[in-house]
């Protein structure tokens, strides 16, 4: 079960439509923000900001095959990379919030209580890079989500939720047939929730497989 609130805004020539989605059931701990943006702004940077009732000098950022803790912005380090998620857990360790996303990778942390995610950017350019003054122009669709958690950061749980956001189940129609793999089939699995299988391929010069 899902409820959605649609918010429409205009800024200059740009149009913004955002759906805030609340769920019941196994996704009740997640709030989704689905966005449709027609971006037509030059010399502009669009961020979303999460001012949280949480205090910590460090946040944890996803690196794809690991994570790293980083502090607040400085004069020389004010935008950092993260892939699927970033997390701010209160210094007490009693609770925290993970921010998930499906396609945006620039983050910053201006103070102990705030996470920000960069969404779109059209930089100011000089004549040598004039072709960049329409960077990110056009239509964009993307989702970011808020997930709260009790206690400290459970990286395995956060990674699982981020993977669910990014690797959505896809359904399609097909004719009825017996198939060759049966009703269930798995190429490979892990019984350790702290181990993620990211890739599986056959070796080039043997019958072995590389994980």
Can you annotate each of these PLM segments?
Residues 1-210:
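C-terminal (or distal) subdomains of carbohydrate-active enzymes
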């Amino acid at each position: 079960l899902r409820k959605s609130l649609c918010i429409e805004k205009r800024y200059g020539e740009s149009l913004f439509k955002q759906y805030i989605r609340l769920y019941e059931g196994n996704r009740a701990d997640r709030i989704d923000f689905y966005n449709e943006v027609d971006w037509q702004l030059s010399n502009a940077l669009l961020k979303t900001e999460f001012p949280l009732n949480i205090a910590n000098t460090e946040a944890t950022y996803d690196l794809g095959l690991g994570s790293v803790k980083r502090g607040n912005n400085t004069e020389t380090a004010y935008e950092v990379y993260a892939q699927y998620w970033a997390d701010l857990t209160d210094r007490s360790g009693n609770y925290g919030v993970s921010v998930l996303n499906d396609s945006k990778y620039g983050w910053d942390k201006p103070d102990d209580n705030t996470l920000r995610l960069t969404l779109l950017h059209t930089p100011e350019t000089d004549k040598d890079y004039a072709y960049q003054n329409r960077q990110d122009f056009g239509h964009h669709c993307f989702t970011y989500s808020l997930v709260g958690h009790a206690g400290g950061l459970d990286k395995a749980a956060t990674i699982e939720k981020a993977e669910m956001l990014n690797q959505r189940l896809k359904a399609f129609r097909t004719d009825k047939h017996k198939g060759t793999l049966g009703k269930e089939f798995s190429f490979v699995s892990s019984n350790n929730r702290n181990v993620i299988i990211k890739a599986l391929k056959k070796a080039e010069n043997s019958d072995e497989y590389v994980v």
